[in-house]
Every structure is written in structure tokens, then in C-alpha cells.
Amino acid sequence: MWILIYLFIIWSSLRTWVTAVDSTTTVGDDLNETVSTSVWPTMSPQMTVAFRSQRDVMGNLTIDQLPYVGLNLRRVLLNNETSMVNEGNNTRLLTLFKSMLSSEANAFVLDLEQYNNDLRVVDTTLLFSDVLIALQSFIFSTQNNLYANIIVLLLNISAPELDSTEYRHQNQTLNTTYILDKNLGNSFIYKPTDLQSDRAKNNTWNIYGKSSIDGWPTLGSVLYEQKKRLVIGELTDFFNETTAPYIFPHDVFHYEQGNSTLDCPSTVEGLTDLSSIHWRFLDSLFNSVDIKEYISCGLSPIISNSAYVNNVTQLADIIHEGSVWSWDSDQPSVTQSTSKSGSSSGTLEAYNCVLLYYFANNETVTWRVGNCYNSNIGLCRYENMAFRWLVRSNKATYFDFDSYQGSKCPDQYSFNIPRSPLEQRSFIAYMRNSSFSDTQIWIDLNSISVSNCWVSGGPYASCPYEKVISRRNFVTMMVPASVCSFALLCIVVYLSVLRVPIYDNRKNWRRVINKISKSELEGVPS
């Protein structure tokens, strides 16, 4: 019995320990997890962390204002695959498409044509349903907080060469809802009805604040609350609300080809006016230099460069330059643990906080990891105004700049960070107008709680990807259970080795009792 009790105690202690270990799984363990690809270069751990942290910073931006980097699939994917398509090798095309999904591109333009009451990819024998199945597979494999992101699919529909009566009949018999439901599932699609519902619930915003008229939901709301991953839009005028209720009409998107008609803003008023335009796409040829400029001007580039399998890496570099608009080329530094250490000079070091570097000579900025214990000035934003900044002149460590005791930012300002290329552009304009020289500035981004998990919300913000148990809390939790287990173990060992005195003297007691019983007289005394 005692042995069973002891084994139960040991099992309980081990279970507690395993639970604690499981709950402290770090994001660093996930750095080597990437969606497998066979054509496109996979993202390095550093690039994965940079892309994820950027997505998290943009969590409170509306999905129509996000900087997307896209690919025109007809120009990029299908221009050199004609012979392969004629051979009926659709597997190769789907492999290329899947590898592109695993890149940093998150918008795709797809040309379709109607074919026997179905939709087919132009110049191929590939059906739209095949593309949707590949898309569904990718969404399933990335449907978690680490890898989930919004994908925009823009459709160019070619009408069949029929007279007007036949065209209307073909259009009405084409059931896009059935195609999407069967091959993708509507649970992943953010639909026009979802937008209507969000606006009715006052869950949408524009540049001025909440708006039930022309607002859109935030990235965080769509990804994490509604679990939506895909926005489908039409660039032509083939469908209508009845024939394609899952697809946004063409007038929702500002889509241009070649050169943009939108000016690149340099004032707060210009930035505000540009932000009132939803879904700003530019389909053109780009290189790794000018794509960054278009991104900083608030446009989402759709790359139409002709690409081949042997130079796909060059195209991947262009996408990367447009996708990562914040971090420096070798940032953020990927670490395996978060710890506080002392340097040879005796000062504390913790490289888990982010500095924004401003270079006055070419008016550029970039993000780099810095020592949280160094003293620097910090960046403040005025209430909920996206483009109104203030840099405090008083220096402080990262922990002191925004702490439980209060922020170094003045009233109505808060410690903050540029959340988009447009906001970063407005910050550059502020620095230029204020005549700042080269400067290093604390911004609200750190990985103090968990290595490689970059979060906003001050020095005490927690990582959303894991439940953190510190070493101190772990020891506090384990010591009582260990002491009790050891004490009970000692008792069990003592009772199993040593005999109780009464048990040892059992025979002696029996002999004494027998002797006493013999001395007693039998019968009734006279």
C-alpha cells in the first residue's frame, strides 16, 4: 500500500514537471519550422522572425491599409511554362504556385477564363479548383498564430466569345459559390457579408477612427478573432453580387498598371488623404531598389517581372526588399534565450529591445536590436493620430522610459512605434522638419519576455505565442512538491526496513501470556 502511494506521488511530481516544461516551449524552437518548398528559397530563421514581428506590429491596422507585396501569376509563373502546360504537366505549375505561397508574397493576380461552366487558368489546362485546393492546403498548414497571414487573391476574368444572350446564360449558370465551397471552404474567406456585419457591429475603422460607412476591420480582428485568411476580389466586371457573393467587386480596389496616378505624400495632410483610399495596388515591373520606394509611398506592388526557374532567387530578393520595410538587413538578431548578463566593464546587457536608427543625410530609417540598459531618447505618438509624433529629449533605459511608474512621454502621448511604411514616412517627415541629426530612438518593440518573440506594449508585454513560466516561478512551484515527496519517501523506507517493537516482541508476549495462563486456577473456588 505504501509503495503504491509513493509511486502515485512520484507520478504527480513528474506530471507537474512535464507540464511546466511543455508550457515553456520557446519561439526559438519554431524558428526551424517553415513550410516546405521545392522551388522557392525558404525564409531563413532571421527572415521568419522579422516578417512575423512586422505582422504583429501591424495587428491594429485595417486590412485595406496593409502593405501587400504581390505577384502577377500570368507574367511571373506562366510566361515560360507553355511547353510544359501543353504536355499536361499541371503538377509542376501547382508546385511552383505552392512555393510562391510559402514566400513573403501575400497578394496574387490570377487570370481566369470561363470553360464549360467552370473556370480555367488562362493559357493552361489548369482549373481554378486546382489552384484553390493548393491554396487550401497552404492555409491548413499555416493556420496558427505563428504563420497565419492575410492573402489577397485578385481575379481577372476573361469572358467567352459569345453573343450577349449566351454570355448572360453562361454567367448565370457559373456557380462560383459551389467552386469555392467545395475546393477551399468559405470559413477561410473574408466575404462582403462579413464586412457588412463588421460595419453593423461598429467593428470597422478608417483613418479618422471608427466608421460604419467605409471602414474595414483590423488585421488582428480578421486573423485571430474571425479566423479568416483570404480576401478575394475581381478586377474585371464579370461577376455580380448574386453570382459571386464571396467575391468583392472591382470598385472596392484601387488597381493600376504601369505607372501610378497617386502622388507620394510628404505632409500629414497628404498622408491622411492617401489613407482614405482603400486597397492601393500597382501592377508593374519592379527591382529591389524602387520597390521599397513604392512601399514607403503607401502602394502595394504587384510584381509583373518575367521570371524563370533558373533566376527565381532574384525575384525572391525583390519580394523580400518590399516585404520587410522595417528591419535592417541583418536584423533582428536571432537568439536562443533571454537573459540579463554583465559585460567586462560591469554594466548590464540585455539585447532584447529595438532602436530606430534615423539617418539625416539620406532621410532613411531602419530598426536594429539594442541593449535595453543603454540610455536613449524615445518615440511618442499623440493619442490615436497615426501621423503625429514626438521624440523626447530626455534619455532613459528602455525599462525606465515606459514603466509601471509612468511613461516619459507627456500627457496625451504614449510610447509607440511606426506600424506601417506610411507611418514611418510620416515619422521621417517629422524628423526632417525638426532638424534632427543622426539619432537612435527607442520604439515600443521588445523580446524581453521570450527570445525572438517581438511584441509591443512596453517592457512587460507578454508573448502571445506561449505561456511563460520563469525559472523563479518554476522553482517555487517544484520545491514544495519535491520536499513532500522526499519526506514521504523517507517514511516509506523507514517503515519498510525497521520493524515496529510490538511486532518484534510478538513471540515474547505470547510466552508471557502462556506462563500467566498456566498459573491461573481452573474451576470454581470453594
From Swiss-Prot:
TM stretches of this protein: 478-498
Does Transmembrane helix count among this protein's keywords?
Answer: yes
Q: Which residues form the signal peptide?
A: 1-20
Q: Which GO terms describe its cellular component?
A: membrane
Q: Which stretches are Cytoplasmic in the membrane topology?
A: 499-526
| Ranges of the Extracellular topological domain | 21-477
Sites of glycosylation? N32, N60, N80, N89, N156, N171, N175, N202, N240, N259, N311, N362, N433
The primary location reported for this protein is membrane
The membrane topology term of the UniProt record is:
Single-pass type I membrane protein
Per the similarity annotation, which family is this? Belongs to the MTC6 family.
What is the name listed in the Swiss-Prot or TrEMBL entry for this protein? Maintenance of telomere capping protein 6
Q: What's the gene?
A: MTC6
